[in-house]
Amino acid sequence: MKEKDKVLQALCDGLGEKYEIMMIDLERCIYRNFGNRFGVEVSGVHTTKQHKKATIYLWCMDETNDHGYIIKKVSDVPRNRIGKTVEELYEYSENLISQ
């Protein structure tokens, strides 16, 4: 396993059981499915550079969960803020559903 794969796995493990590593648009990313037709992609962290900031995309998926579109993007997220930012996006998705 390459060092950057180990770093990505450690970051994913640190975020918790709800997160997994997936290939999205030819990039190894961290993904979390919210279970409400929304999910997040944590991009830009498949590297050994600890100072590299993430870009987090909020996706809205279709009924089959095969196709989706990005409805919100949060850039320049430090690694120690990824979990908190994802929780904020979860709340945002729940608010969209309740409207």
Model-derived features with residue positions:
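Short intrinsically disordered terminal tails
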Residues: 1-2, 95-99
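Negatively charged, low-complexity tracts enriched in Asp/Glu with abundant Ser/Thr
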Residues: 1-37, 53, 61-86
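A short acidic-to-branched-hydrophobic micro-motif
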Residues: 40-44
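Catalytic phosphate/metal-binding cores of nucleic-acid and nucleotide-processing enzymes, i.e., regions
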Residues: 47-48
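Divalent cation-coordinating acidic motifs and surrounding scaffolds
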Residues: 87, 93
